Amino acid sequence: MRIHLIAIGGSAMHNIALALKQKGFKITGSDDAIFSPSKDRLAKHNLLPVKMGWFPSKITSDIDAIILGMHATVDNPELKKAQSLDIPVYS
């Protein structure tokens, strides 16, 4: 199962990403800014986004679910793309 976390850098969100990866899920994520210790922990587990920002091109039909962090707004371009593809969104 592939899961994308929008606003992966939050204190709760990065822990969710790490736990899901440990359970065997394929995890991707994005954020406009990530600070330590979240940044360091995501990097250690190869989950730190290469580039900061929101990229609708990251949202593809092979994603099974989106987890939306509190930092993301309703007009987030990745969220809008996920909704257009009918990908389930959890927050």
Feature map (PLM): residue ranges:
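N-terminal leader/targeting and accessory segments in enzymes
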Residues: 1-91
